[in-house]
Amino acid sequence: MKVSVVITLAVLGVMFVWASAAELEERGSDQRDSPAWIKSMERIFQSEERECTKFLGGCSEDSECCPHLGCKDVLYYCAWDGTFGK
């Protein structure tokens, strides 16, 4: 009885190690492919240029902000400049 329990536990242990190794091999191939995917997505987002920086967006001067927004001097973000109109 004890021998059959030990054999069963040993077989389960071997199966667990085998399944874990297969999973790590799959996950490893995903990780090797992901940097190229991330770089391609980075290129896509960098190619899009916005016309102006929207409300609370980062800026360095007023001309970067959308109409009726100005660049704040302290934290350098676009905020309403107090004007109305189209």
Swiss-Prot record:
Main location: secreted
Expression by tissue: Expressed by the venom gland.
Cellular location(s): Secreted
UniProt GO molecular function: ion channel inhibitor activity; toxin activity
Gene Ontology annotations for the cellular component aspect, listed alphabetically: extracellular region
UniProt cross-references to InterPro entries, sorted A to Z: Huwentoxin-1 (IPR011696)
Positions of modified residues (Phenylalanine amide): 84
N-terminal signal peptide: 1-21
Keywords: Amidation, Disulfide bond, Ion channel impairing toxin, Knottin, Secreted, Signal, Toxin
Disulphide bridges, residue numbers: 52-66, 59-71, 65-78
Highest taxon of the lineage: Eukaryota
Chain coiled-coil ranges: none
Propeptide boundaries: 22-50
Annotated family: Belongs to the neurotoxin 10 (Hwtx-1) family. 37 (Jztx-31) subfamily.
Biological role stated in the UniProt entry: Inhibits both peak current and fast inactivation of voltage-gated sodium channels (Nav) channels. Inhibits the inactivation of Nav on DRG neurons (EC(50)=1.77 uM) and peak current of cardiac myocytes (IC(50)=0.90 uM).
Entry comment, domain topic: The presence of a 'disulfide through disulfide knot' structurally defines this protein as a knottin.
Protein's name according to its UniProt entry: Mu-theraphotoxin-Cg2a 2
Species this chain originates from: Chilobrachys guangxiensis (Chinese earth tiger tarantula)
